[in-house]
C-alpha cells in the first residue's frame, strides 16, 4: 500500500501552474509555491487507499480493468503494469468508439488474427509481394493500436486512465456506458467525470509509474482472492479462406479504422 514517503519521492504533490487549473480541484489543493499548485497529500493518500480497495475488490470479483494512457510519460508504464496484472491496455492512440462501438473494434482484431494465421500457415507466401507487404503493414498498425486489447472479448468493467484531459474521449465513452473511471486527477482536471479520483500529478514519469504500479498491485491482490478460475485463453474461431481474401483486399485499399492523415 502506498505511503506518504512514496508520494513525496515521486512528486505526486506537484500540480500545474496556477494559471492552468480547474476551479473544481480547489478542495484538493494545499497551497501554491512559485506559481505551482501543491496538492494536499493527506487527501491524496486517503483517496489512494480507498480506490486501491475498490480496484482490488473489482479484481476479486473477476472484473476486467482497462488501462489507458497514451501520453509519452505513460506509454511504457501502462503497458508494463497492465501486463503484470494481466489486464488489457491502450497506450498508442485511443480510437473514437473503442468502447461505444466495440463490435467494430473486435472485427479489426479479428483481421489481425487472420493475418497472423496466414503467416503461420504460409498462405501469405502465395500472394504477390505487394499484397504481402500491405498485409504486414496492416498487421503492424493493428498491433500498435489494438494489441493491448486483442484478448479483451467483452467491454471492460472499469477503466483506469492516466490524464483525463488528454484522454477525454475515453472518459466520455466510459461515462456514457456508465463504466466506473479510476484516475489520478491533476490540478487541471475535472474531478466530476471520474468515479474514483486520486488527486495527484499525472505528468511526471515517476508519479505515473507509481499510480500504475499501485493499480496493478491492487488487481493482483484481488486476483489472489478469486477462487474460481476463468478460461482467459478460449480457442479462436478457425480462419476461413473467405476471411483471408477479404483482409487482403482491404489491406490493398484504405484502412478501415484510421485514416493515413491521423498518422
UniProtKB/Swiss-Prot annotation:
Family from the record: Belongs to the universal ribosomal protein uS2 family.
A biological process term (GO) from this entry: translation
UniProt biased composition (Acidic residues): 228-240
Gene Ontology cellular-component terms listed: cytosolic small ribosomal subunit
Protein name: Small ribosomal subunit protein uS2
Disulphide bridges: none
NCBIfam families in the record: rpsB_bact
CDD domains documented for this protein: RPS2
PROSITE patterns in the record: RIBOSOMAL_S2_1 (PS00962), RIBOSOMAL_S2_2 (PS00963)
Region listing for Disordered, in residue ranges: 223-246
Cross-referenced SUPFAM superfamilies: Ribosomal protein S2
MF annotations from Gene Ontology: structural constituent of ribosome
Keywords: Ribonucleoprotein, Ribosomal protein
Keyword Ribonucleoprotein: yes
A Pfam cross-reference name: Ribosomal_S2
